[in-house]
Amino acid sequence: MERCSVAQQFEDRFHRKFYYLRLSVTDVCNFKCTYCLPDGYKPSGQKNSSFLSVPEIKRVVKAFADCGTSKIRITGGEPSLRKDFPEIIHTVASTPGIEKVATTTNGYRMEKQVGQWRDAGLTHINVSVDSLDSRMFHQITGENKFTEVMRGIDKAFEVGFEQVKVNVVLMKDLNSQELPAFLNWIKDKPIQLRFIELMKTGEMDELFDKHHVSGVAIRNQLIANGWLLKVKAVNDGPAQVFVHPDYQGEIGLIMPYEKDFCESCNRLRVSATGKLHLCLFGDHGVELRDLIQEDQQEQELIDRIQAQLQTKSVSHFLHDGNSGMTPNLASIGG
């Protein structure tokens, strides 16, 4: 079997092509967000040394790039907690075929380190800011770091990022009333604000029942006020992005409970311990680590991934109350 080419890339039985890999490099996080790790990070018994090494990351990324993947998002946990994070960015960015290197961060280390990340090759950045009210931010994240995170976003613009994406997990009775404040914030800033519906995971049933709210009301409000839906690029994520002539910023909505959400799925996930996850809400991960120990194993790695893609479901089963085996969003990178 020949190596993948762009004409022969990772594709499932529903003819979905996979241009986008979410690569977790740690499941450790220093925040205690109510919707993810409300009790803080608890080690699963494995040592941090069991997270993917830089050479292993290089082999994973090369295999995906050779099969048409052009965008890699480095996730966690909190990826910047890895001391070799700039080296990881450089390794990903220097892989032929990779055009976009993104990360998602809680922003805690951005003010001091975002310049290093950009120099290493980071092209896109997402920051979690679940409230513009510092007290509510503290309540949701468990950390009183609102000012530091906001300074980090300013620093990202200073070092040359043209746009910063800001993730907001939408929660009824906590931050669901903050749309006017968020709109005011992005009026003159090139921020893409992304409202993400709260998702049910294994440990979060009660929180979901109490705080889940659909993004449909926000979408209707945006459309009524002249916001227009933007056309997606091939390696974009699932967000419905809206633009307005009077705003420098943009609004994105991620609504996993929306009909046909999975129809345009274009991403795969690899966990920090080297398991392939076909879906955030899948039932299991597939071991890849035994095939990323030597460069010459690449074809075996590609073959295993391609074989697994033929088992990928057409959709998640969230509507049936089945969120798979994902205990929390930190465990495989959200």
Curated annotation (Swiss-Prot):
Keywords: 4Fe-4S, GTP-binding, Iron, Iron-sulfur, Lyase, Metal-binding, Molybdenum cofactor biosynthesis, Nucleotide-binding, S-adenosyl-L-methionine. [4Fe-4S] cluster 2 binds at residues 262, 265, 279. It catalyses: GTP + AH2 + S-adenosyl-L-methionine = (8S)-3',8-cyclo-7,8-dihydroguanosine 5'-triphosphate + 5'-deoxyadenosine + L-methionine + A + H(+). GO terms for biological process: Mo-molybdopterin cofactor biosynthetic process. Residues 13-239 form the Radical SAM core domain. GTP binds at residues 22, 73, 104, 165, 267-269. It comes from the Bacteria. [4Fe-4S] cluster 1 binds at residues 29, 33, 36. The keyword Metal-binding applies. This is GTP 3',8-cyclase. It comes from Vibrio atlanticus (strain LGP32). The gene is moaA.
